[in-house]
Amino acid sequence: DQNLILLDGIPVYNADHLLGVFSIFTPEAMKRVTLYKGAFPARFGSRLSSVVDIRTNDGDMKQYHGTASLGLLTSKTHLEGPIWKDRTAFNVSVRRTYLDWLARPFLDKDKKYGYYFYDVNAKVNHKFSDRSRFFLSFYKGKDHCDYTRNTAYEYDYASYYYNDGMDLNWGNTIAAARWNYVFNHQLFFQATMAYNHYDMKMSTGYQNLDKVHQEEALYVYDSDYHSGIHDYSVQADFDYTPHPAHHLKLGTSYLYHVFQPEVMIS
């Protein structure tokens, strides 16, 4: 928890899929990555370990281009280009795994297991003038894991039927608006408003149906566990260069945390 990972300046609470096998960042959507292993600037806060600062692609204002790839486990597509040539550009990247589809034909009909994840990156970049730019960026990623098991036992004197299952989801949602303005060759200003949400939900259920001597008894157990974080933030930064040998960074920020732990059992 002492490693800070930023996507366009916004903290990312969960940066991987499949317990660390895949990163949530698709290369086509990224512009640059800066790693601070230590002695990082004060603007990154009070984390004790490292900082990974990731910036997404702004989009091409001149022409359209993109890529599409089909892999053994995942497929992804990327497209960028102008909305208004030389003024507004977009960048969109989508990725999804299909482990759930590939495994389905090989599973027992009474036992169903599934896992998938997806990522969506989108960004719009508008140029008001040579001095002023506005950016809208969005990220949505999710992991989903589930299983269902049905078991039946038949005896001369009784019949038992068991059904249990689990549904687990976790992921990030990030939305940000940023405005850059160049006052002159010495002073640069940047304002950012952002919303960041991490959510984890797990639901489990168990059902037992017994038939003994024509009498029916039903037992049901359900539980829901939810852990969520909502961040609302506003930030303003100034870069001032009074002399080629001096560079001053000033800024202020406000961050409002909302924590949502929840347990429901019935």
Indicate residue ranges for each PLM-predicted region.
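Short acidic/polar hinge/loop motifs at secondary-structure boundaries
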Residues: 10-37, 122
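Extracytoplasmic loops and strand-loop junctions of Gram-negative outer membrane beta-barrel proteins
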Residues: 15-16, 35-36, 59-62, 104-108, ...
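N-terminal periplasmic accessory domains that precede
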Residues: 20-26, 35-38, 42-65, 77, ...
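Membrane-embedded beta-strand positions in outer-membrane beta-barrel channels/transporters
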Residues: 32, 37, 51-53, 65, ...
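Residues that define the transmembrane beta-barrel architecture of outer-membrane proteins
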Residues: 46-48, 71-75, 116-118, 169-173, ...
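Transmembrane beta-strands of outer-membrane beta-barrel pores
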Residues: 56, 72-74, 83-85, 96-100, ...
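Periplasmic-side early beta-strands and strand-to-turn transitions of outer-membrane beta-barrels
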Residues: 61-62, 84-170, 200, 204
